[in-house]
Amino acid sequence: MSEILDGKVQTKNTKTDEEEAKAKEKHERSSVKASTQVDYFLNESFVKDCFQQQNLLSKLNLSDFKILGCEINPLKIRKNKSVIEFKLQFASKKRKKQQQEQQQPLSKIIVGKWRPDGRGKEIFDLLQEVWHKGFDMEGADDHDNDDEDEHYHLKLYEPIAYFPDCNFMLTSKASGIQLKDMLVQKQVEEKEIETHIMQAASWLAKLHSISLLPGGVYYYSMKEEEEKLNKWSEHLSIHPDFGKQIQSMLSCILKIKRSLNSKCFVLIHNGFHPGNIFVDGSDLTVIDFDHSCISDPAIDLGYFIAKLVHSKREYNLSLNVESLEKRFLEKYASAARMSITTTKETLERVDLYKARSYIRHLHSKYYKQLHSKSNDNKPNPVDFEYWVKKAEECLNRWMKPACMCIMALYTVCDSFGIMPDTSLFS
């Protein structure tokens, strides 16, 4: 384990062999239990019985129906998270068998998500509260102006049920096509893409405006953020050309984030990118609240824009991302229910999180290659430099002069192998 201290990576004592052995044994036991829980939901008979016994049909407003069949489609099966799609077929309890055979059976697709860490119930409760405070679509046919019409097209996947004994959550399946696929497949006019990106800005403003009951939502943890950025710094620091620069940028990002006033924090999605957004006609639905928490709203804005920049480069898109970013932020600002000052300060922090996202991309894409012993499996030098420069540009636009001086000081001192004195900037 390591941490960034004055711009350098400091190594802590590792666990003893005995501690590691106990941790491994505990993990293996939990993995066996977890595997068993997930396996249950891959069995059609179990699923049908479970859903009937858990009164699922009443939650789907199908109390007068029974489950005829269940088609199971595992989307992702992992030790830390599994996602399974269920296509259920129903028949009316009141109709005779002959009538049921003649009529096309009613079907519905729902999605189950399992995770072993116990946060599933917390996520489900959060989804329910958010759903009832702005996304339940009740009265959707009663709107009589353009603003309300836009509001009702901004949707959330519906929380249906949670089974605490199995750590299993059921939600509706988002309809339509992923915004990411619309970007990558290049089969949609750019004007339509731009329309949905503006919708995404309105969706974020809608989410960020929701006031939640106290005590029920996970708050952003500075400790977890420090651990994450420390890990990135340690892993990327071995790059011969940009290791020191990345360390300095991450150190500066941490310093800035520590100084933020939590009074500006709101409910954020914390994973808002085109892969979690589905478009169906004029409807836009967002999924995956697994990392949602109370934190800086600029996180969602910066991450979404950074993902657009990444998609443009990765898939050679013709989108004018700079223009889209400007319009995206303007749309968010016009829809946000914040004071003018708070909105302005939020938008000013977007570059901070774009820089963080670019470094996150470097870590995700090149960490294993950096540590590979094979000379044939090293990072693409042009691409690596591109993302370092993008992060640097964002920080240079945003950072206060004092922070820029700190970065320069770190770089100079590192070249001489000495520790910088940053007390003058505190």
Q: What positions do the PLM features span?
A:
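Juxta-kinase regulatory segment immediately upstream of eukaryotic protein kinase catalytic domains
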Residues: 2-20, 24-72
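An alpha-helical support segment within catalytic cores of ATP-dependent transferases
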Residues: 49-64, 212-269, 391
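Active-site acidic catalytic loop and adjacent metal/ATP-binding pocket
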Residues: 73-97, 105-106, 167, 254-299, ...
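ATP-binding pocket architecture of kinase catalytic cores
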Residues: 89-97, 103-215
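A general structural signal marking secondary-structure boundaries and capping sites
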Residues: 131-138, 204, 208-212, 257, ...
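ATP/Mg2+ or Mg2+-diphosphate-binding catalytic cores
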Residues: 241-244, 315-320, 341-344, 357-426
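Active-site activation/catalytic loop segments of kinase-like enzymes and analogous catalytic loops
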Residues: 298-337, 354-374
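Acidic, serine/threonine- and proline-rich low-complexity regulatory regions
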Residues: 338-351
